[in-house]
Amino acid sequence: MDTLTSAPLLTSKFKPSFSPQQKPCFPHRRRFENGKKKQSIVPVARLFGPAIFEASKLKVLFLGIDENKHPGNLPRTYTLTHSDVTSKLTLAISQTINNSQLQGWYNRLQRDEVVAQWKKVKGKMSLHVHCHISGGHFLLDIFARLRYFIFCKELPVVLKAFVHGDGNLFNNYPELEESLVWVFFHSKILIREFNKVECWGPLKEASQPTSGTHSDLKLPQSCEEDCECCFPPLNLSPIPCSNEVINNTYEPIDGIGTQHGNL
């Protein structure tokens, strides 16, 4: 995934575009030597290039979970992190968030992790994906718009990583690719523009770069009392939907957590 804190702000409102024909956001600088223009070698951020999933760069960890167990019966959570040094992705598949992936100053600076949880609501499976846009330190707030853009651009790659890394699950239960994907963007109260929930449609479509949101759909609500049609129960959900990581664990705070406390 592209670096989420080191690129300039994009000031215009936009919807992510995946056309490889777009011009670079940051043109190369030019310098003059002996009266001639000479182009310097300056890295250009690949913000508008195609988002491509490379299976060879994905490392998958199964942590205390049955690879073949249906997520409607056993909690199943994905924790995906990215290394800007190696350009590799690490995907942990477990019953709860793998907090060890979120530790360290670098991860706290970047906050480019994506966590997701399978949920069954009123008998229907859906994948709830969580992205941290702003809150925690000032750089995240300054680059909130750019971070939202990058997350939207890279999410199809993330979803492909989930499907590829959890291949045995999808081979055994191919119907899961028909499940709706709900994306929760978490942003501090002062930047509410990016504190929202979007439906990206069925997983098999959401993992494609041309997928769009389905604004006509409403987020399904779990039953308030114990039932058999919803899973996991509210008190066992590993993702209480937070805007910030406190002590390396997700904690519910104001914002989306207040609006949708049953996530």
Swiss-Prot record:
- The secretion signal range is none
Asked if the keyword Plastid belongs to this entry, the reply reads yes
What additional remark is attached to this entry?
Answer: Corresponds to one of the seven genes studied by Gregor Mendel in 1866. The wild type line JI4 has a functional SGR protein (AC A7VLV1) lacking a two amino acids insertion. This protein is involved in the chlorophyll breakdown pathway.
Give the location in the cell.
Plastid, Chloroplast
Its lineage opens with:
Eukaryota, Viridiplantae, Streptophyta, Embryophyta, Tracheophyta
- Function of this protein? Non-functional protein probably interfering with the disassembling mechanism of the intact light-harvesting complex of photosystem II (LHCII) in the thylakoid membranes. Responsible for a stay-green phenotype.
Q: Which GO terms describe its biological process?
A: chlorophyll catabolic process
InterPro entries attached to this UniProt entry:
Staygreen (IPR024438)
Q: Which PANTHER family match?
A: LP06106P, PROTEIN STAY-GREEN 1, CHLOROPLASTIC-RELATED
Name the source organism.
Pisum sativum
Q: Where is the transit peptide?
A: 1-54
- Which conditions up-regulate this protein? Up-regulated during dark-induced senescence.
UniProt keyword Chloroplast present? yes
Give the similarity note.
Belongs to the staygreen family.
- Which top-rank group of organisms is this from? Eukaryota
Q: What is this protein called?
A: Non-functional protein STAY-GREEN, chloroplastic
Q: Which GO terms describe its cellular component?
A: chloroplast
Q: What is its main location?
A: plastid
Q: Which UniProt keywords apply?
A: Chloroplast, Plastid, Transit peptide
